[in-house]
Curated annotation (Swiss-Prot):
Organism field: Arabidopsis thaliana (Mouse-ear cress)
Residues at which a divalent metal cation binds: D66, H68, D101
Protein name per UniProt: Putative metallophosphoesterase At3g03305
CC cofactor: a divalent metal cation
Keyword Glycoprotein: no
Family according to the record: Belongs to the metallophosphoesterase superfamily.
Spans through the membrane: 514-534, 565-585, 623-643, 687-704, 716-736
Amino acid sequence: MESIGDDDELRSKTVSLPRRISFTILLLLLLISLSTRVSGSLDKSGRRVIEARTGQDLIWVVQLSDLHFSVHHPERAIDFKNIVGPALALINPSLVLITGDLTDGKSKDMLTMKLNEDEWLEYESVMQDVVKRSGLNKSIFYDLRGNHDNFGVPSVGSSVDFFSKYSINGQMGRKGNVNTITVETSERKHLFVGIDTTMHIGLRGPTNLFGHPTDELLSSLDSHLSQWDNQSAKPVAKISFGHFPLSFTALSHSQKSLKDVFLKHSISAYLCGHLHSRFGKNLKRHHHSGGISLSDNDLFQLNMRQSGAESTSNCSFGALPAAEFWEWEMGDWRKNRAMRIMAIDRGHVSYVDLDFKSKPQKTIILPTFPLDSRFMSTSFARHKYECQHMISSSYDAIRAIVFSHSLVVEVVARVYDSSPGFDNLVMEAPMRKHGGDSSSSGATFFSLPWNYRAFEDPLPDRFWLQIEVTDIKGRLTLSEMRPFSINGLSSKVSWTWNEFRVMGCQWAALYYPILWPALYSLFLVFLIPKCIIIVFKKQYTLKKFIAKKGPITLVLWILQDLCRMPVVWFGYMAYLFYLIFFPWFSGEVFADSGDRAYMTIMGWVVTSSGADRKHEYIGQPDVMVVVIPHVVFVVIPSVLVVCCLVAEREIYKDHIRTVSGKKEDDHDRGRKKRSQRRSLLFSNRRLFRKSVLLASLALYWKHFKNCWALGRAYEMNVVHFPGYSLVVPLLLLYVICKTHKVP
């Protein structure tokens, strides 16, 4: 009996074992599936894939930038908490991208720049609240490091690297400089690649202004952007996002750029921040592989679109449209409370910028097709039109997303023909809602079938689209009027001067082209007249200038008089050599380390933390914010002031001789008349000299402010930068005293 019982027990254990294994496997599969639904799949390289929740070939994301949370301005964080959480709950995006400058890192007087942990604690707390109030998964938030988040950080992972500790990326374990997430619909993959191009050794400001992509980062970016090229049967829309615009991004060590990689992959757009809204609303730039820039080195781009960017498409078999992408800088949260919603609808990229500072956003309208002809990727659109590759399903309807706190009862699309006037309405019709509960608010997709070929026209801004939304409370909301072009032609938009200054100038490449001509010009100012005196034995004097007037004679006379003041001539020559070959000052560039580095025109010389403890230059071209203003707005003006003082002394001396009758020549009536004409400026009152002295006082004040700001920024006093701070004021003072009395 015992043996029979043992057999039954053994049989029951044998039967139950496969059931347990099967149950365990099913449980694991269920957990994996649940995890994938919540946060997407994650491969070993940190490349996530999530499924879009829209049910259509349509996604939208939110971008925020330049939050600048500050202990001195608590309203920034308070407004962010009160506004952004509910807004995200309404918008319900697939991703939330925060493109840098999460905290401010500045003292109250804005001169000392290093990270403040209290600001990071506030950022962490606010983001936790925003995630909770939005109802979104924390994993869809991507925040990037900006230059303000890197002030005084000697290395990633150091004790003052608060970004790695308190940011969402840091807490989610996203440690690389390149992070990728793919949002997938049934028809398309949408690849988003975030890049951190901040300095690998973070200096304090103000010499921490530019993005610094390394060759390793560019190689990694290239790899991430190409991850689906040979693996997906679906088309791929590519978007990159970072903090720095390309105009404030340096080249890598091998002289490669982000622009090269972006054009190689013909991404749709590069989203960035950094510049803020104070420079203008059109901080956008179109990059095109076939465009013509002002110079071979791409130092300038005069217009938002490059010249020659709209060539005829090549429609031969297998030919692709010319590589292009848009660079879209967005406004800041710091002062303007800006937010951007960007949508990709069947491959068409559009966006709307929101301003939460001026008015509450009860209803938001984002037209997704037709695209705004001012900011569309025209090579792609024109290639499809001219080569008849247009997919009718993506062109056959006007489409828009409406985000509303209240129930939307009517959406009307209107098309205006601007050729006879701006009020010629040529189409007006209600749009039809797609999906969702008819009694619900939130994000809703609307469309209106139309005959798009009726709007083909060689003018890119003839037809304009506007959408009107009426909610259940009777509130009317109008979208911004925007031109569109079915033909894929671009409508021209011009930069203002400020917009061109920050977007059209490649500042990293302009550093040396500005610096060296300025320094060479100063050398020539002092060397040419000296050589004329020594080598050619020619003397230029006031008497010679009066006899033979001309700009060259005038300049040579003044400069030769300057050469006859040896203290001034040798002083400036020595100072110019000092500026080129010697350190300008020694300051604390890292937060709370106490270690000092010294700055030259080539960058900051710091001692690396590696075993070899080698010295390396960092912060080039960032040091241009110190070097260029000093050379152009202090040294050069001081030379002009000195020349004016020297010239005034000679003219006044001539005036005194004429009036007193002690001139060596005969008393010439013509000279006396000229002396009388000059008497007002060069009489005993010496009004011209006084005006020059006022200019020198303004120069003193500017130089003092620069010295004060640098002293506060890098914890320096006069001992740490005597050459930078004292030479120009002392030379000016010497000339003022020397030219005061006329023998």
